[in-house]
Amino acid sequence: MVDVCAEVEEHMDNLDLAGVGVNVGCYGSVVATPEKLQELVDVARRVEERIGRKLDIVSGGASSSYMRVLDGNIPEGINNLRIGEEILLPQDLLYLYGYPLNGMYDDVFTLESQVIEVRDKPSYPVGELGVDAFGHKPVYIDKGIRRKVLLAMGHLDYCDYKDLIPQDKDVEILGCSSDHTIMDVTDAPRTYHVGDIVKFNLIYGTNLFLCHSQNVQKVFIDEE
């Protein structure tokens, strides 16, 4: 990295070297520990020695690095975080790392889906079992006959149903096909009917897919 930064600084007149940054979690699932972020600071100092000036930006990662700020142990020298999810949602630090963000709205994005079927059905599929539409072998628990609802959305819209957070805490998402989602509402005090709207909170991955889906209507509400 030092050589690349020096090349930009010294030979690429149409580019300005503003700083250096790191991405730890998006692919490699590396935790942004103080030690890992200190490696970035050390690289930044080597770059500064090479180019003979201070860097404007030393970016310590994205939303997953914000827990270092909350713990008060982010290394000195990091002056930037590229935070998006924790401002817009915020859910990931709470559900994935156990860090609540007090004072932040967690309902900026709400997914709404319509109920298109309500029926009592066996909880364990009837027949010889193989794989689902995506080549997986789901595990089913026999709970007898359960009240199930079918929603008009599926894997194509939000990627992974396990990352949907129902606002009704008494329902269970059982699974999905490419364009439908199945929920168990047997234990819910609310009685569900065809045409009802079910609401979900989102985390980063589901929100990413929904925002890019042409099948999902986006409604912007300005309370002011």
Spans of model-derived segments:
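Active-site loop/helix belt of alpha/beta enzymes
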Residues: M1-F109
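Residue-identity detector for glutamine
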Residues: Q38, Q91, Q114, Q167, ...
